[in-house]
A protein has these predicted regions:
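Alpha-helical transmembrane segments in inner-membrane proteins
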Residues: 2-360
């Protein structure tokens, strides 16, 4: 991968579009402004974590939350905080970060502002594997879904790359997109057919399929954390070459970027991140689509900053959506995937209505 200053030059181009219209750059145009904005985003994330621990069908005072974290005594409120809300908050942080970064990567690689992590068939592959495990192996525990879902996500991505690499030119963004959409349609249809024929599988899948953080444990967080960490490391490594790839394959190659290698690494990172997120929480839409746009609108087209902002803002959206889902129908709750869809759908409509919206 190229690390030359030339390959990084597009990051500072003053008239580069952001994908949200014909904007010259982000709101924060200087390094200092971007750093301050990132600190503000981190502060908002801390607030979202606090809300996730405090707010629910049974509100817990902030002081009690602190006592539960520092001096656990087994009381009812302490059990709620330590055994229920803290694990789902940690999983929400990991899943949100994974979805945000994978969304930014896939939009950069495909140069498509409407792309999301599921475009490579990751969600469909994970869902298909879980359906098979539930219908034919009788799995009932959510924690047992993780490895099947992750294996399905990896298998789907490999299949998409195998199909998209055929023919002259190799794995172009258009071919990968078409292969991913086709595979997702096929796997989704088969999954629906199996669940309709097996009522027990349908009953077990309906909550996981909607995307939820309820019932997640610290063990599940520990299971997906290494995959998320590996995906984030790869994302940071490809951030600089992606600035060149965003200009097009030919120009990126002339600037010294290794387009093919960058594309493969992006695919690996997206599979690790989105696969881990889907395995832990089920398919959650719109987070990986919407957050990279907000990041790009804020900081401009530099992928290094977009990835950092996406890693912070995406868990904010996910945790806030989870909190909203807990309180709107209390004492029950809405799955976080449903809430993010309600938030993300208007944003998607606004993006479609922008005739000047373009790639990176």
């Amino acid at each position: 991968m190229s690390t030359s200053a030339t390959a990084d030059a597009p990051a500072d181009a003053p008239r580069t579009t952001t994908g949200l219209g014909d904007r010259p750059a982000g709101l924060a145009r200087t390094g200092a402004g971007r750093s301050v904005g990132l600190l503000v985003a981190v502060a908002v994330l801390v607030l979202a974590v606090g809300l996730s621990l405090v707010v629910g069908s049974k509100p817990v005072p902030l002081g009690t939350v602190w006592d539960a974290l520092t001096g656990y005594d087994g009381s009812g409120d302490h059990v709620i905080v330590r055994d229920l809300r803290l694990p789902r908050t940690i999983v929400g942080l990991l899943v949100g970060t994974a979805l945000g970064v994978s969304g930014a990567l896939i939009q950069a690689m495909t140069r498509n502002p409407l792309a999301d992590p599921g475009i490579l068939g990751v969600n469909a592959g994970a869902g298909f594997a879980v359906v098979l495990a539930v219908a034919f192996l009788g799995l009932t525990d959510i924690s047992s879904f993780i490895w099947f879902a992750f294996a399905g996500a990896v298998a789907a991505t490999v299949a998409v790359y195998a199909v998209g690499s055929q023919g002259r030119g190799g794995a172009t963004p258009v071919r990968l997109t078409l292969a991913g959409v086709a595979l997702a349609a096929v796997l989704g249809g088969i999954s629906q057919g199996i669940t309709l024929l097996d009522p027990q599988a349908f009953d077990r899948m309906r909550f996981w399929g909607a995307g939820s953080l309820a019932g997640r444990t610290t063990e599940m967080a520990g299971t997906i954390a290494p995959f998320v960490a590996a995906g984030l490391v790869i994302a940071l490594l490809v951030a600089r070459p992606l600035n060149a790839v965003a200009l097009g394959d030919d120009l990126a190659s002339s600037l010294g970027a290794h387009v093919g290698r960058t594309r493969v690494l992006v695919g690996v990172a997206v599979t690790l991140l989105c696969g881990a997120a889907t395995a832990a929480a089920g398919p959650i839409g719109f987070v990986g689509l919407m957050v990279p746009h907000v990041a790009r609108w804020t900081v401009g087209p530099d992928q290094r900053w977009i990835l950092l902002y996406s890693a912070v803002l995406a868990p904010v959206l996910l945790l806030v959506s989870d909190v909203v889902g807990r309180v709107v129908v209390a004492p029950g709750e809405l799955q976080v995937g449903i809430v993010t869809a309600f938030i993300g759908a208007p944003v998607l409509i606004a993006l479609v209505r922008r005739s000047k919206a373009s790639g990176l």
